[in-house]
Amino acid sequence: MSELDQLRQEAEQLKNQIRDARKACADATLSQITANIDPVGRIQMRTRRTLRGHLAKIYAMHWGTDSRLLVSASQDGKLIIWDSYTTNKVHAIPLRSSWVMTCAYAPSGNYVACGGLDNICSIYNLKTREGNVRVSRELAGHTGYLSCCRFLDDNQIVTSSGDTTCALWDIETGQQTTTFAGHTGDVMSLSLAPDTRLFVSGACDASAKLWDVREGMCRQTFTGHESDINAICFFPNGNAFATGSDDATCRLFDLRADQELMVYSHDNIICGITSVAFSKSGRLLLAGYDDFNCNVWDALKADRAGVLAGHDNRVSCLGVTDDGMAVATGSWDSFLKIWN
C-alpha cells in the first residue's frame, strides 16, 4: 500500500469521524422543531414591472441598498442601472468585455462593479464630478474567470473566481489584501454575512465554506450536495445560509449546528438552480431554475409555496430588496421582472 493510499484512507476516516460527531450533536431535525408552526400557504406574486433594454442574455443583477435602483449585466456588453419604480435607465455603461458574469452595487450607491471571463473586476464610479460614468479601477489578479463580487464598502470588495479562490481587494491600491484558498473546484458564488465579518462561498467541488474576512481563514466547510453549487445566500440573521446546486436541490445549512438542516426539492424538479435569495424575514426561500421558473419555498417546512412563472428562458439571477418589498428576476430572455 503506497503512502498516498494510506493518506487517502486516513482522510476518509477523519471525514467519517467528523460526520459521526456532527450526527451526535443533532438532537432534533428542523422538521420536528417546526412541526407546530402554521404553513405559509399559497404565495402568489404578480409581475409589477418588466425592465426592457438589454439585447442579449442577462447574467447577473444586484439591488442597491435604497431598494429602488438595481444594476444588471448582460451578454450585450452593457451594465444598466435601472430605476425600478419608473423602469427608466439611469445609466447604460458599455463594458470593455461583453463576457460578464457578475455585477454588484456598493452599499453607498457610489459604485458598481462587474467582471467575468476577462478575469478582472472592474469598478465604475457613478458619482463623478463630470457626471459621466467611468472605470475607476480594474482589479486584476485572478487567474480564472470572475464568478461573483460583493462590496464591503467603497474601498473593499470580495470576489470569487474560477481559479478556485476568493479574494479581498483594496480598491484604492488595486491590490489583493487577502486570498481565500481551500476550494478544489471553481468558486461560483459568495454571500456576505449581515455584519460583513464573514462570508460564505459555494463551489464546483460541491462544498460551501465559511470564511473570516479579516483573518483569511476557512472557519467551516459544509458538504451534502452531489454536484456544483451555483448559488449561495446568507439567512437574514447571519446564522445560516442556503445553497442552490446542479443536483436540483437547494439546501439550508446552519453555522451553529455545523450541518445541513433542510433540503428543498421536488420529484418534478430535475434541473439545476442558478440563484437563491431569502425574503426579509427568512421564511421564504426563492430559487431560480434552468426550467425558466422561480420557485418559492417555505424555508421552515420545505414545502413549495409558489412559483414565479413569466420568463421565456432560464432564470439566471434574482434578488430581494433590502426593505423586503420586491423581488427581481433576470433571465436569458433578456428581461428583468419585478414581482411583489
From Swiss-Prot:
GO cellular-component term (any): cytoplasm
PROSITE patterns per the UniProt record, alphabetical: WD_REPEATS_1, WD_REPEATS_2, WD_REPEATS_REGION
GO BP term, example: posterior lateral line neuromast primordium migration
Keywords, in A-Z order: Repeat, Transducer, WD repeat
SMART domains: WD40
Record's keyword annotation contains Signal: no
Intrachain disulfide bonds: none
SUPFAM superfamilies membership: WD40 repeat-like
GO molecular function: signaling receptor complex adaptor activity
WD repeat windows: 53-83, 95-125, 141-170, 182-212, 224-254, 268-298, 310-340
Subunit structure: G proteins are composed of 3 units, alpha, beta and gamma.
Family the UniProt entry places it in: Belongs to the WD repeat G protein beta family.
Function summary: Guanine nucleotide-binding proteins (G proteins) are involved as a modulator or transducer in various transmembrane signaling systems. The beta and gamma chains are required for the GTPase activity, for replacement of GDP by GTP, and for G protein-effector interaction.
Protein name: Guanine nucleotide-binding protein G(I)/G(S)/G(T) subunit beta-1
Origin species: Danio rerio
Gene name in the database record: gnb1
